[in-house]
Amino acid sequence: MKKRLFALSLVLLSFTARQASPQNMKTEECRIKLPGITFTRSLNHAADHAKVAGGRVTLASEARRDNFRDPDGKLSNNTAPLLLTEVDNKQPFTLTAKVTPTFLKTYDAGTLYIYVKEDLWLKMAMEMDERQKTRMVSVRTIGTSDDNNHDVIEAKSVHMKISSDTKTVGFYYSLDKKSWQLIRLFKNDYPASIWVGISTQCPLGEGTSAVFEDISLTKQSISDFRLGI
């Protein structure tokens, strides 16, 4: 009986260890501490490309780095650097950040993420589109990725917000951090343990970067999912 209990304990410990990092991905432990958040996992060597100064982090992307799983498989790319921290998805949470991307090539972007594994994630981005307009973009990936272009943003920076009350996830942006515009609402049917964080992408260019500041992760949700407040 003791041997069976010991074996069961080993199985449970192994399962717990596997759940301690984003699934099916090679991540590295890190500790990048900012006033409102501490990133503890680095995906695709993100920590090696992050510089912290004055309460902000600049995250660089090397050439041809992106996260997108095209339905036809031709453009799939899972190489963008992500800085992540774990969230208890059984509890409300809100992630906000001011994002200032450097736009050099089409699809360059600074992004916020909800991340579970390589083929299960959500992202919201300030991105340069095919007409060289900068706009809000959202992507939901469940096996393959959808792709949604939203409002054009003429400012150099934008405030982004992801909020969940455990049942619903909302994506929002603001130019003044006061008036928030809804982008998308999703059902929160993600696992009990998820990861949230930031990323920079450069699918077509030779590299770029984005500055993330005023980052905050709280254990509260917004109260109005239409107004984002």
For the regions a protein language model found, what residue spans apply to each?
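Extracellular glycan-recognition regions
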Residues: 23-229
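Bacterial Sec-dependent N-terminal signal peptides
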Residues: 1-25
